[in-house]
């Protein structure tokens, strides 16, 4: 009696569920259409995951991250499969569609990542004013050297992103984007077409301007206190030149900065976490023509 390998035994267990018979009975073209729908779904969702700091490769390891992308893509695969044009798939067209889906995912991930970049810049501003930039550490969220307050803020926002429900807002924006920008739009000259709005460059610059403006507004109270402390230490240096104000300023500014953060941190979190689906899809809708 021939021996049965572990792989054959595994396939026999699957045969009992009927999964293998389902795949065998499926037409060849139909099977490829399901595979192409999965690829297109993973292109948009994987592109968004690649940009959002809380979901990058450095935060979620490779296998777990790819499994998460595939799992979240499964919800969009039937919707994409339903909208496919009839007939045998055109693989050149699907290649262009995959690139288009990745671009849309990158743009959605970019606007979802704005709060993370804002708080990191706020931390850098505060640490620059209190003279603590020498204590920079590596941030797995951005892959760069950031200040201690900056990485504290980014990790705090990352925690709230998962615990506070912002991940649901992010996923809701991703799934809602399929109704705004379908995978199979109207074709121009037989090729898939992704139309940017006429003022797309202005919209991108406006988003960068808003990011810098929010950074300055959020960090302004702490920086003003630091400035007043610097003025006060300057007056002390005028009246008592024998004191080494430079070394005295570092602990004084650090203590004032930490005290201000304790008072001001709830307002910072409320300002940043007031995020709705429209906050992500609104700028994208201005950037792309649906």
Region locations from a protein language model:
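Extreme N-terminal basic, low-complexity initiation segments
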Residues: 1-13
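Hydrophobic alpha-helical segments and their helix-loop boundaries in membrane
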Residues: 10-290
């Amino acid at each position: 009696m021939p021996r049965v390998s572990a792989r054959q035994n595994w396939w026999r267990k699957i045969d009992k569920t009927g999964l293998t018979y389902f795949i065998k009975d499926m037409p060849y073209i139909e099977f490829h259409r399901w595979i192409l729908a999965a690829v297109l779904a993973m292109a948009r969702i994987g592109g968004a995951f690649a940009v959002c700091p809380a979901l990058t490769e450095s935060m979620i390891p490779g296998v777990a991250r790819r499994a998460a992308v595939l799992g979240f893509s499964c919800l969009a695969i039937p919707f994409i499969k339903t909208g496919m044009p009839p007939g045998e798939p055109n693989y050149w067209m699907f290649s262009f569609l995959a690139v288009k889906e990745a671009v849309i995912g990158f743009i959605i991930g970019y606007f979802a990542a704005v709060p993370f970049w804002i708080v990191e810049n706020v931390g850098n501003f505060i640490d620059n004013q209190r003279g603590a930039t020498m204590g920079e550490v590596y941030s797995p969220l951005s892959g760069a050297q950031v200040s201690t307050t900056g990485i504290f803020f980014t990790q705090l926002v990352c925690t709230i992103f998962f615990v506070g429900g912002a991940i649901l807002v992010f996923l809701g924006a991703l799934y809602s984007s399929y109704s705004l920008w379908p995978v199979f739009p109207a074709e121009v000259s037989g090729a898939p077409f992704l139309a940017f709005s006429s003022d797309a460059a202005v919209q991108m610059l406006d988003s960068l301007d808003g990011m810098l403006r929010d950074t300055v507004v959020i960090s302004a109270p702490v920086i003003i206190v630091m400035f007043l402390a610097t003025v006060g230490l300057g007056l002390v240096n005028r009246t008592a030149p024998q004191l080494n104000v430079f070394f005295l300023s570092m602990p004084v500014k650090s203590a004032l900065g930490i005290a201000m953060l304790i008072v001001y941190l709830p307002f910072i979190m409320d300002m940043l976490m007031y995020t709705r689906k429209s906050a992500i899809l609104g700028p994208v809708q201005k950037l792309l023509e649906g």
